[in-house]
Amino acid sequence: LDQWRELNKSPRWSAFHFYDQGREIAERCVRAPDTMRAIRLLPQPDVALRSPTAMFSVLQPKTRIPPHTGVANFRLVVHLPLVMPPHCGFRVGGETREWRIGEAWVFDDTIEHEAINDSDELRVVLIFDLWNPHLAPEEREMVRAMTAAARAYTG
């Protein structure tokens, strides 16, 4: 999509994935054992080839991630700021909040959201998935089964 043109194959926005679309990247997980220990204590979705996702998201100075949406609300996304200089912003829907180090923002990423680093310094956020707490265990299993069936059908 044209909205991503400036960031495609650009070091201006990068991610260090621990989990990527449901696949653990073991050699990266061992590099952040405390982070992984904490994430593994949380109710993460386990939907084959979809979730969980966990990463350090790095946004270079004077860089904007354009408005975008996720594709599934069976999960919520957590943004936990780790390195947050002044003049960084994050918007979900019509709500913009001030970042506070150590305070997570949990949201449904099917709602349009964007991030801005208007500072002269690097911004780092830990991003990871959680099961949507409104889903009962039976509904979670239906999400897994439906996703697996769709993957089998589409190849």
List the model feature ranges, each with a label:
Residues L1-T69, F74, P85-C88, L135-G155:
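Fe(II)/2-oxoglutarate oxygenase catalytic core
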Residues S51, R75-V77, P85-H87, T110-E112, ...:
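Active-site lining segments that contact anionic ligands and/or coordinate catalytic metals
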Residues M55, H79, E114:
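Short, surface-exposed charged micro-motifs
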Residues I65-H68, G89-R91, F107, H113-S119:
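Short beta-strand His + acidic residue motifs that chelate non-heme Fe in jelly-roll/DSBH
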Residues V77-P81, V106, E121-A136:
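A short hydrophobic beta-strand segment most commonly corresponding to one strand
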Residues L82-I101:
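A short beta-strand-loop-beta hairpin characteristic of the jelly-roll/cupin
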Residues H87, E112-E114, W131-L135:
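Short Gly/Pro-enriched loop/turn and capping motifs at secondary-structure junctions
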Residues E98-E112:
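Conserved metal-binding segment of the jelly-roll/cupin
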